[in-house]
Amino acid sequence: MKKFILVAFMTLPMLAQAQTFKYQKDISNFKQYKGDATLTGTYSRTLDPEYLEYMGDAICFEPDQKSSAHIPRPKGDERTAWFCFSNFEQAKKTFKLPDTIKKDYCSYEGKATITIKDYNLFVEETEGFDLTHLVSAKNITSAKAVKCETQY
């Protein structure tokens, strides 16, 4: 009996982690999930004109390895956990991101711990990204301008 209780307490955190988001339904190119999570990682905004023309203006987040476990992924989907915020203006204000960037720089990046609500997993095999709602952020580092990567 003691072994059973010990095993139950040891697996409880894993079960709780796996249930951060609960699948709701498919809509268009997205699988919709309900729930919330607190994640640590890197926020970013790319202002490179070519990128903006192709993908549009977005503020995105890449969770660190530990936090990535909270992001819903169907079996076999090995994409890096990465998403953008559906409430762009709130994210821009929260992270204090400017609308312009100096020459030879393409993006802003910083670190933060964020809380997100609901998750829309992009499932189409084309350009696009997952979307979620930014609820709050703390431990925010100031955004730093990142130089453009030169491609040869």
Question: How does the language model describe each region?
Answer:
Residues 25-69, 112-118:
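Structural detector for short beta-strands of small beta-barrel domains
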Residues 46-48, 70-72, 131-138:
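Short, intrinsically disordered, charge-biased short linear motifs at domain edges
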